[in-house]
Every structure is written in structure tokens, then in C-alpha cells.
Amino acid sequence: MAKLSIKQRELKREQLVAKFAKKYAELKAIINDAGKSDEERYTARLALQKLPRNAYPSRLRNRCELTGRPRGTFRTFGLARNKIRELAFKGDIPGVVKASW
């Protein structure tokens, strides 16, 4: 299980990404627009660099909702592979059945 502080850090990052998402998208659009002048694109890049480090979506990590495990997490369920297995065998995940062919 991941420490509670790790889970809280990830939650804080998600909130920062959501807070700065609009500004981030606007600046990225300016930077990637070839029709803009070099000076405008340069100032947009400087403004992007002044955003908080944790405001970048690339710093987010998918974690298991139950354990906080960072690897082996399925997006569909939001759970780690071992927790999916446990819950599926108990029958707690609707529609998931053991495969047989």
C-alpha cells in the first residue's frame, strides 16, 4: 500500500492540473501555431515555464483507488491488477467473469 502522503500528493497534482488546464491549453495552442510570430510564441513559452511544475498533465500518475499502487493499474476500473483479481473472484465487479474457452 502506498503511503497516505503519496496519495495526497497525487490528489494535489490533479487539482493543480485542473486549475491551470485552460491557461495551459491556450499557451500550448499559441506555441504550436505556426501563423504566430516568433516573439509571440517565445513569450508564450516563457509564460508556460512560469506555471507551477505540478500543473503539467504529464506529471500525473494513474494509481489504484484502493491501494495507491502506481503500476499495473487498469484505467477501466481504476484498480490495480491484483485488486481486480480479488474483487472479481468475490463477484464484487459486475459483469466480470472468469474466462473459459
Swiss-Prot record:
GO process terms (BP): translation
Note the superkingdom of the native organism. Answer: Bacteria
What are the entry keywords? Ribonucleoprotein, Ribosomal protein, RNA-binding, rRNA-binding
Q: Which GO terms describe its cellular component?
A: cytoplasm; small ribosomal subunit
Q: Does the keyword Cytoplasm apply?
A: no
**InterPro entries per record:** Ribosomal_uS14 (IPR001209), Ribosomal_uS14_bac/plastid (IPR023036)
SUPFAM superfamilies tied to this protein: Glucocorticoid receptor-like (DNA-binding domain) (SSF57716)
Record-linked Pfam families? Ribosomal_S14
Task: Give this protein's Gene Ontology molecular function annotations.
Answer: rRNA binding; structural constituent of ribosome
Q: Does the keyword RNA-binding apply?
A: yes
Q: Which PANTHER family match?
A: 30S RIBOSOMAL PROTEIN S14, SMALL RIBOSOMAL SUBUNIT PROTEIN US14M
Give the record's family classification. Belongs to the universal ribosomal protein uS14 family.
Report the function annotation for this chain. Binds 16S rRNA, required for the assembly of 30S particles and may also be responsible for determining the conformation of the 16S rRNA at the A site.
Task: State how it assembles.
Answer: Part of the 30S ribosomal subunit. Contacts proteins S3 and S10.
What's the protein name?
Answer: Small ribosomal subunit protein uS14
Q: Which organism is it from?
A: Methylibium petroleiphilum (strain ATCC BAA-1232 / LMG 22953 / PM1)
Q: Highest lineage ranks of the organism?
A: Bacteria, Pseudomonadati, Pseudomonadota, Betaproteobacteria, Burkholderiales
